[in-house]
Swiss-Prot record:
Entry membrane topology: Peripheral membrane protein
Family: Belongs to the ABC transporter superfamily. Phosphate importer (TC 3.A.1.7) family.
Name of the protein described by the UniProt record: Phosphate import ATP-binding protein PstB 3
Domain of life per record: Bacteria
Catalysed reactions, semicolon-separated: phosphate(out) + ATP + H2O = ADP + 2 phosphate(in) + H(+)
Catalytic EC class: translocase
Gene Ontology CC terms: plasma membrane
Localization, UniProt: Cell inner membrane
Primary localization: membrane
Gene Ontology biological-process entries: phosphate ion transmembrane transport
InterPro entries, alphabetized: AAA+_ATPase, ABC_transporter-like_ATP-bd, ABC_transporter-like_CS, P-loop_NTPase, PstB-like
Residues given in the record as ATP binding sites: G47, P48, S49, G50, C51, G52, K53, S54
Length: 268
């Protein structure tokens, strides 16, 4: 049984997961997930490979829907509305809940158009120049690119490209930003810039980050969820939530032995 202790009782819940089971065909990938994501906090998902961290992350903006064999049972609420209800438009979900992927993936467009494109297709009618500048400033990239906005986004360094992708996500004015190992392809200096940016962004956004780097989780997050995986008799692997608590508690005083073993490096 997972320990799910909310130490942020005064904080509004943005996402609420209730008894979520995720299948790919007949294969059960995630089992019995109960988890509340607090507003304007950074929540980290940690755990060994194959435990379902990224699968759960993609449930929040329904990216898993693009996988034909995907099926979800249970409920995921966004401000009390079930994201998997029949009347919910997945495209609108993805506008409100943005995504930054493991490897930087800027469009093969100019830096300016990387930011403007999503806003245009979402019907933005305001001052586009101001939106582009504001988004790049929020992503701590404006000063580095303000004189080359018409150059290709692909001309930037890896760290700059990832911040461009964060700016692109910000431009469509989401409420939540999901980050799937956003620093795994970056050098240490670029990683530090992104971590500093995460601290700044949580003033305006709710952030959920998947990371294999436990030191990173300890540095950037307010809450941490530890997932583990158990083998089945048929050779499958089922991910499950072991413990969810304030990050300080997870790393300094975990309640579950498996959590203690993982954060101390005994397995994983």
């Amino acid at each position: 049984m997972a320990t799910n202790t909310s130490t942020l009782n005064s904080t509004e819940t943005v996402l609420k997961t209730e008894n979520l089971n995720v299948y790919y065909g007949k294969f059960l990938a995630l089992q019995n997930i109960w988890l509340d994501i607090p507003k304007n906090k950074v929540t980290a998902f940690i755990g060994p490979s194959g435990c379902g961290k990224s699968t759960l992350l993609r449930c929040y903006n329904r990216l898993n829907d693009l996988i034909e064999s995907f099926r979800a049972e249970g409920k995921v609420f966004y401000y009390g509305k079930n994201l998997y209800a029949q009347d919910i438009d997945p495209v609108e979900v993805r506008r409100r809940i943005g995504m930054v992927f493991q490897r930087p993936n800027p469009f093969s467009k100019s830096i300016y158009d990387n930011i403007a494109y999503g806003a245009k297709i979402n019907g933005f009618k305001g001052n586009m120049d101001e939106l582009v500048e504001r988004s790049l400033r929020q992503a701590a990239l404006w000063d580095e690119v303000k004189d080359k906005l018409r150059q290709s986004g692909l001309s930037l360094s890896g760290g700059q490209q990832q911040r461009l992708c964060i700016a692109r996500a910000i431009a469509v004015q989401p409420e939540i930003i999901l980050m799937d190992e956003p620093c795994s392809a970056l050098d240490p200096i670029s990683t530090l810039r992104v971590e500093e940016l995460i601290h700044e962004l949580k003033e305006q956004y709710t952030i959920v980050i998947v990371t294999h780097n436990m030191q990173q989780a300890a540095r950037v997050s307010d809450m941490t969820a530890f997932f583990n995986v158990r083998p089945t008799e048929t050779g499958g692997r089922i991910g499950y939530l072991v413990e969810y608590d304030a990050t300080e508690s997870i790393f300094n005083n975990p309640k579950q032995e498996d959590t203690r073993d993982y954060v101390s490096g005994r397995f994983g």
